[in-house]
Structure formats: C-alpha cells, structure tokens
Amino acid sequence: MKHLLGLEKLSRDEILSILHLAAPMKDIILREVKKVPTLRGKIIGTLFYEPSTRTKNSFELAAKLLSADVVSVSVATSSVKKGESLKDTVLTLEAMGIEAIVIRHSRNGVPAYLSSCSKASIINAGDGQHEHPSQALLDLFTIQQYKGRIEGLKVLIVGDIMHSRVAKSNIYGLSKLGAEIIVSGPPTLIPEEVKNYAQVEYDLDNAIKKADVVNVLRLQLERQEAGLITSLEEYHRFYGLTKERMAKAKEDLLVLHPGPMNRGVEIDEEVAYCDKSAIQEQVSNGVAVRMAIYYTLMGGREE
C-alpha cells in the first residue's frame, strides 16, 4: 500500500492488517518508554488547509513516537498564501526529502489528485465531505478492542450522514468487516444512497434498542442556518444521545464520538463520560492507529 486515501478502495484484508498492527502500537503508547526507532531517518510533512487540533496533533505525535521527523507546514504563512498551487507545495516538500504527507482539505478528492503527481505517500486526514479514513480505522479498532469482534455487530451511526466524511468512511469499513449498519437522523440529513449499505431508522428511540455500538456524529451548527434542521433544541430532542435514551439501550452498548463534541446538542455530557463511553479511549487509539498507518505505508522496520 502506497497511499491512504479512503476506506472505499481498501480491501477487507488491508483494513484488518492496519487494525492488527495498531494493537502493538497501543502497547508502545502505554509503556514507560514510548519511543521506538522504527521510522528513524524518515521525514513526514503535515499540511492542513482546514483547522484541526486533535487530528493534526495525533498524526504528529504518532510520527514522533516512531522516531520520524515532522515538518508542519503553516498554510497561513506559507507560499500557499502567495498563490502557490497545491501540486507545487507538495512537490516542493517532496524535493526536500519528505516521504509522506498528511493532508486535510475542504475539497473532495484533493488527496487522490496529489497521489497521482507525487512520489511521497499521501495520507488523507479528511477531504471535504468525502472520507476521513484514519478516524474510521480508529473507530473500528476501538469497537474491536471493546467487543472482541466487528462482524455481526449492529452499529448505529447518528446524525448528519449526508455531509459527514466520518460517516462515509465508517460505513465503508463496517460493511467490509461484516457489521450490520443502522443510520438515524433527520430525513434532510440522510442521503438516499446510504440505503445501499445501511438500514435507515428515523426514530432514534427505536434504533438505539437494537444497537451494540452507537457512533454519534458531531453536528455542524451551520446546518441550522442552511435550514436542514429546525433548531438545535429540536435536534437534541429527537436525535441527541441523552440519559433517558441510554436507559432504552442494551446493557453493554458502546458509545463513540469522533470529537469535538457539541455537548447538549448531539450528546449530553453525562452520557459522554458514562461507563459505556469509549470517547477518551478513541483519542489514544487514534495515535496507535496512525502509527500503524505510517508503518504500513513507509516500510517500518523492527530494530
């Protein structure tokens, strides 16, 4: 595997290989001496055209724990602001010896385009409304860690399925690993084509009774301005994960959220930090999974 552009094109075996590698990477994070020399001498660049805290930091920490050097390009002060094209920026980084580039961009397909014109490995950290593969992989790893399997589980995804790159990558990954997918949200935020992959259930109170795992998507607040939801209060009433809704769920329900959370909108704080929640674990699992991605793409070696 040369690039990580999305889960739609990955095979089941490629997904499972990354999840398998993430387990020993998690062990590294938990031990006293966290750094290993696996990617010593390698250089990784991060190029974020959209604001990011946790994803950018997670990718950079993952690289450093594998002993790679990291070059973080500040888009706000770089040649990009002077009119340099994306292609020129990436080829310049490549000419400096950078071997992998982590990119986030607001336009669909940018990582795929760059992979066609660069010798460096391109890692998609989120492109428009298309995909967010590393987030889906860490979600899959977290489910596997808590449930021991993915195949046969009923996984409920709640929220704005239409615009969410997290939802799309999760749906591709879950379907390839044999999960039964249920989606729930306002009709205005559920695309027709999702019915090819998932059962659509507009009544969250009914959907949550069936679920083994619930992944609550962050609601982009501009959806209200666009008229796709009536109000945040109404969204919370019908699709917020509340303590009252949790009482209807299975005893061993697993709660996930990609973060950052809008508390009191898509999820209540007491649910986010309840004993069924693995939201904090997702953060540490994200570092482990991104270490596994680097190892897969950059020919990691054991020393």
Curated annotation (Swiss-Prot):
Keyword Metal-binding: no
Pathway named in the protein's UniProt entry: Pyrimidine metabolism; UMP biosynthesis via de novo pathway; (S)-dihydroorotate from bicarbonate: step 2/3
Superkingdom field: Bacteria
Gene3D superfamilies registered for this protein in UniProt: Aspartate/ornithine carbamoyltransferase
InterPro entries (alphabetical): Asp/Orn_carbamoyltranf_P-bd, Asp/Orn_carbamoylTrfase, Asp/Orn_carbamoylTrfase_sf, Asp_carbamoyltransf, Asp_carbamoyltransf_Asp/Orn-bd
Enzyme Commission identifier(s): 2.1.3.2
GO molecular function: amino acid binding; aspartate carbamoyltransferase activity
Catalytic reaction annotation: carbamoyl phosphate + L-aspartate = N-carbamoyl-L-aspartate + phosphate + H(+)
Amino acids binding carbamoyl phosphate: R54, T55, R104, H132, Q135, G259, P260
GO aspect biological process, one term: 'de novo' UMP biosynthetic process
Binding site for L-aspartate: K82, R165, R218
Gene Ontology cellular-component annotations: cytosol
UniProt keyword list: Pyrimidine biosynthesis, Transferase
NCBIfam families: asp_carb_tr, PRK00856.1
Family per similarity comment: Belongs to the aspartate/ornithine carbamoyltransferase superfamily. ATCase family.
Physiological role: Catalyzes the condensation of carbamoyl phosphate and aspartate to form carbamoyl aspartate and inorganic phosphate, the committed step in the de novo pyrimidine nucleotide biosynthesis pathway.
PANTHER family for this protein: ASPARTATE CARBAMOYLTRANSFERASE (PTHR45753:SF6), ORNITHINE CARBAMOYLTRANSFERASE, MITOCHONDRIAL (PTHR45753)
Subunit structure: Heterododecamer (2C3:3R2) of six catalytic PyrB chains organized as two trimers (C3), and six regulatory PyrI chains organized as three dimers (R2).
Name under which the protein is recorded: Aspartate carbamoyltransferase catalytic subunit
